[in-house]
Structures are given as structure tokens and as C-alpha cells.
A protein has these predicted regions:
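Acidic catalytic/metal-coordinating carboxylates
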Residues: 35, 61-64
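Active-site residues of response regulator receiver
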Residues: 11, 54, 82
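C-terminal output helix
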Residues: 86-88, 102, 106-115
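Two-component/phosphorelay signaling modules centered on CheY-like receiver
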Residues: 2, 14-31
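AAA+ ATPase active-site-proximal loops
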Residues: 132-150
Length: 150
């Protein structure tokens, strides 16, 4: 049995946090935070696979939180949520490192699919890196033996 992915939901609106938590907790380990400080405390404590953050967190910015989260040694995949959806906001979030963007009101099936797609993408990136490392190692060993034989 595999360990479920860890999701962090960051939103200053309690009903949004709790609704998402209830929707996702059957498939994932879910943490919730109401602001950037709570989110960073969780992120620094345990590795988080995916962070869903609202654009506006009271007086704080979800964009800034993404920037902080991506500087961690094990950065989460970041997905921006907002009721203030615009193409400009989506582009800016992705320029700052967000994997994707979703608008409120949230379609819970869409959020679930988006998270699973993000996790699959990260898994494929890790597998690709490992295969690349193995190929490089193989060719360096073959080059070594070619030099030894000549």
C-alpha cells in the first residue's frame, strides 16, 4: 500500500478550507491553514506534495506564499485558487512557479483531477531524472572501458 500524497489547503475562508478538506481527505492526507504564517509552519515541518492556495489571504498574497514555498528544500506543487480569475492573474501565478490555476467557485471534481494530474507529472519528472542518471552512468562506464581497452 502506498502512502497517500499530502495536500495543504491555504485559504482565509474557513468554509472553503473545510469543504476542500472534506472533499479530498478520502484520497489524500490533508492539512489546512488560514494564512501564510500557518502554511509556512506546516511546510517547514512536513514535506507537502501539493499546496492549494487562495490568491487573497486576508491582507496577504497567495503569490508571495508560492514564492516562499518554492524556496524550500522540498517545494510543493503549487496551485492557485481565486475568485478573481483573469488570464493576467493566471499567467502571473504560473510565472511565479504555480503549476496551474483554478477559479472559484471550485468544481471539486476538477480540483481532484488537477491534483492527481500534478502528482502524476511530478512522478514522471522524477522517473525521467532517474532514467537520465542511469543512462549517463552507463555511458560513462562504457566510455571508461573503451579507454581501458584501447
Amino acid at each position: 500500500m502506498t502512502t497517500p500524497a499530502t495536500i495543504l489547503i491555504v485559504d482565509d475562508e474557513k468554509h472553503t478550507r473545510e469543504g476542500l478538506r472534506l472533499s479530498l481527505e478520502d484520497d489524500f492526507d490533508v492539512y489546512v491553514a488560514g494564512n501564510s504564517a500557518e502554511a509556512m509552519e506546516i511546510l517547514k515541518g512536513d514535506p507537502v506534495d501539493v499546496m492549494l492556495t487562495d490568491l487573497r489571504l486576508g491582507g496577504e498574497s497567495g503569490m508571495d506564499l508560492i514564492g516562499q514555498a518554492l524556496k524550500l528544500s522540498h517545494p510543493p506543487i503549487c496551485i492557485m485558487m481565486t475568485a478573481y480569475g483573469s488570464v493576467d492573474t493566471a499567467v502571473e501565478a504560473m510565472k511565479r512557479g504555480a503549476y496551474d490555476f483554478v477559479t472559484k467557485p471550485l468544481n471539486l471534481d476538477e480540483v481532484d483531477i488537477l491534483i492527481k494530474r500534478a502528482l502524476r507529472s511530478r512522478t514522471l519528472e522524477k522517473e525521467n531524472s532517474e532514467l537520465k542518471r542511469q543512462v549517463e552512468k552507463k555511458f560513462s562506464i562504457e566510455a571508461f572501458w573503451a579507454r581501458v581497452r584501447s
